[in-house]
């Protein structure tokens, strides 16, 4: 794919509007993970160093569109940026019809406070475009949404280009999906086959080995004729699991950790017992890979040249159910393969064991990451490609 890049543009003295994904989790107004903001900061610094007058826009949360909601304000993000950059980053309210600011870097209040954002309204997008000489799309995490601040504005801005973060995401995913070094091992976890079926289909066509974890693995365990007790699985998708197994090499749990506790009783004091998948009882629930499966997956990763990871192998939020995910995560971190990881739960697992700097590329995208892996066109990237041809 060919898009214009921010690094190739003359930004000196220009008004540069940058769309970032600063949709961070908040707890009582306090940011609980700054990963997305930290990932965006190099782009902001690069634009400032190039002499640009920078305005940053983002969404946060799911407020009712067109209505101000203090709980969805980007004020905590502006405060964090100010602290991190050592300069005041003003938060600009009511900016859509133009604003005045002396600062070289401002944060525009939540784009979702503008009516028409979600429907990609042309009139709104034109107002956004009027605020800049150069529009920079740098929010991979929202690239799968055709909205005014991700797609529409790129249609109308004088210049529309990809920022360093977006470019790096596309480059990293391209290394996995276009011409990967082989063997390519894809690890897909999560709770349900149904929510990841298109991903499983897509990666089964390019991966040398497909490893499944979590509730997805449970459905495959059942497809092999095993009792799965009270485990989360999808009986109606057993034929799909069997089809995938016939299509490619699929690795799923042959031993598991189980508990007899109901999920409402799970705690950090819970206990899980390891056993063969063929020995699961009707009153037991699978919560993790068993040690043999985890070791087998780690060995597969050790021999890989490329690793794609999306989704945990068990209920890693509880330490008693986390061993499988930890073994796999550490194997990826220690591997010499090019590795890319994406998805919210995957990032949480990486954070849990502080492994981010040992993964080749950690994607900030959730839905966008999955849609790209599925081979879908991302609207925000497609419009940048169109503009690059013009």
UniProtKB/Swiss-Prot annotation:
Organism expressing this protein natively: Cellvibrio japonicus (strain Ueda107) (Pseudomonas fluorescens subsp. cellulosa)
Protein name (record): Phosphoglycerate kinase
Binding site for substrate: 21-23, 36, 59-62, 112, 145
Keyword Nucleotide-binding: yes
Quaternary organization: Monomer.
Compartment annotation: Cytoplasm
Annotated gene: pgk
Domain of life: Bacteria
GO biological process: gluconeogenesis; glycolytic process
